[in-house]
Amino acid sequence: MYHSRMPTASSLHVVLVHPEIHWNTGNAGRTCLAAGATLHLIEPLGFSLGAREVQRAGLDYWEQVDLRVWQHWEAFEEVLPSLGAPWFFSTKGRQAYWDAPMGSASGAVLVFGRETAGLPPQLHERYAERFVTMPMHSAHIRSLNLSTTVGIAVYEVLRQRRALAL
């Protein structure tokens, strides 16, 4: 890790692996701030973090986002066990996200792939049992928008925690 804005005790982490679209990252950051989550970005990114569009998508909240930037997945993976249980979101997941026990008090790490290709194959192999999906009614839809999926997943964790009274 080489970039961090502020320390956090967050037990909810959102990880975007190689995000390509600045608007999605800005929106995900805004959701993280609203939910008290840390946003982790795994390089390479498809944009500059200094881009006006990223900041506009996050509105005037962007500077308050607890942001961590990692040069590659392996660097992030070293700290992953200390953050909580990872859940990988993919159209290839076998379990619906609402059936996954993501609300653990020990921490939840929600991992999302890039907009055009999803998560790298090596993550599918290594973490196959941790993959979840967002069921979709229409076969005409390949996937949901990344920032929409982040919002659904983050608030599902919060809903589960409330149900568990954590």
Q: Where do the model's predicted regions map?
A:
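Post-transcriptional modification and biogenesis factors for structured RNAs
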Residues: 1-166
